[in-house]
Amino acid sequence: MDYLYDFSSKYNCLFLRGNRDEYMLEQRKIIAQGIENGRWRWNSASGNLLFAYQQLNEKDFTFFDQLPITFRYQKIGYPAVTVCHGSPVSSRERLLIEGENTKEWLKDIDTDYLICAHTHLPGELEYQGKHYYNCGSVGIAIGTCGYAQCMIIEDQCINGKIAWNPIFLKIPYDNKRVVQDIRTSGLLSKAPWYVNSNIQILLTGTDYSSQLVELANKLAKEAGEQDFTDEKYWREAAQQLGVPDYR
């Protein structure tokens, strides 16, 4: 967070609030109201979130709270762009390249360009003369282990009109060093199986994280339990999906 504050003090930056930022704000309210149900615990279901939460301070929460979930980027002489994390109305809506909701949003927005993230899957879609670009993910890049995904847009002239053209980048980094940092941080012991899934993505590009959550929940319900935080359900789900134990 200090890096973001320092960088934005030197350069013109625009920030969005993502779903994880909202989780942090919601957890803060739960704790402030003294509500036990919904509080994060050290387990595979919420331990990774609690770990992040405990690194934050009041300045960070204020920063998150002031962020928009969408904005319109307008530069004189260039086409306007709608920018959001998930969708223009929700940081948690997934706009996949082939998704029907993606096409609906392209029809609904009042710009010809929509830039999103959230899915961790970079790509582009042209639909009815409008353009959807997903920049992918820097931290948890699916399908490209050892690379951080990001995107820049460049202006180009097409048939006498200015248009935005995406350039999708893959930036190499030391993913094994990141995994070692995760191990030494103690995070693996606080949220073992979800973090194991994250490490699998970092090392192989293979993502089972959402399936892991769904299967652990399903196994718990089949056992007659509503609470799926017991690690035995996560361990069984991981074994069925092929998520290794990196501890």
Where are these regions (language model features)?
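Active-site neighborhood of phospho(di)ester-bond hydrolases with catalytic His/Asp-centered motifs
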Residues: 14-19, 84, 113-122, 132-136
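Short acidic, glycine-rich surface-loop motifs adjacent to enzyme active sites
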Residues: 80-88
